[in-house]
Amino acid sequence: MDKFDEKVIGYDSIKETLRQIADVLKRPEAYKEKGVSMPRGLLMESAPGLGKSLMASILMEESGRKSFVFRRINEGNTFLGEMKDIFDVAKEEAPSILLLEDLNLYVESNSPYAPEWACLQACIDETSDADIFVIATTNDTRYMPQSLLRPGRFDYILNLNPPLGKTAEDIVSYYLCDKNLAKDVQISDIVKAMPQVSCATLETVMNLAAINSAYRDHAHVQKEDIIDALLKVVYNLRKTDCEEDPQEHQMIAVHEAAHAVVGEVLHSGSIGIITIRGSHGAIGGMESGFAVY
């Protein structure tokens, strides 16, 4: 088992691409002998919390190269100069690898003509004769100029999607492995109740479930501990301190049950969770409950 499999659950095709890149960077002569032009960059795009930075750090470690990380920390006129400086340092230390974290935070506007993009493109082009491999991560490529995204600047562009199915179950199992789960809790039910959420969200939900369990003096992490955690973290639903109206609760329950019945008829086994709890504890209107399927 290599470090990609050791530290990252799922994402097999992504990991295989990263292994290939690492091999190219470690054994450049073997590839050059076959007439290969060395790749210059990798761009990883996904919603937050899906492991871009983790995978990038593993690639940097596996490459065996001198590594540098650059993030936008300061506002104002110094940023462009700092970006140029880090490219100069990476060039001096070549062969090297440079990680540009969170490109979406580099610019202050949604324009593809922003000066930050022009500066980044110039930095990449001006170091084209140096043995620098650039990794960049971003939450959104929509406002990046197409000229920056073309092969020759970023030869690899990888899109990470939220974990689904068995991968999501494996991630939940990993975060529950030391938390003494009750025997009647099914991992598949947990995943179905919060489809297409990030790895970081799964971790947060499982940790909060363990906190709920300990606070309630449960011997094991119970289903109610997990449900309360995922309703709060994933759906932003909390218990209300307002006076409850049993009749209104019943009406909402019937309404949501009807949604669930229709969902089950149309797609058997698709119902993930049903609740009458509303956003911020609200009862009534569009915030008065839902069914996930």
What function would you assign to each model-found segment?
Residues 161, 204, 261-265:
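Generic hydrophobic alpha-helical membrane-span motif
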Residues 4-191:
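Walker A/P-loop NTP-binding motif of AAA+ ATPase domains
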Residues 7-12, 37-38, 113-114, 138, ...:
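Conserved phosphate/pyrophosphate-binding and hydrolysis machinery centered on Walker-type P-loop NTPases
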Residues 210-293:
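Conserved P-loop NTPase/AAA+ ATPase motor core
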Residues 90, 103, 175, 190-216, ...:
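AAA+ P-loop ATPase catalytic core
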Residues 2, 106-108, 181-197, 205-208, ...:
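Short conserved motifs of the RecA-like P-loop NTPase core
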Residues 15, 117, 169, 203-206, ...:
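Hydrophobic face of alpha-helices
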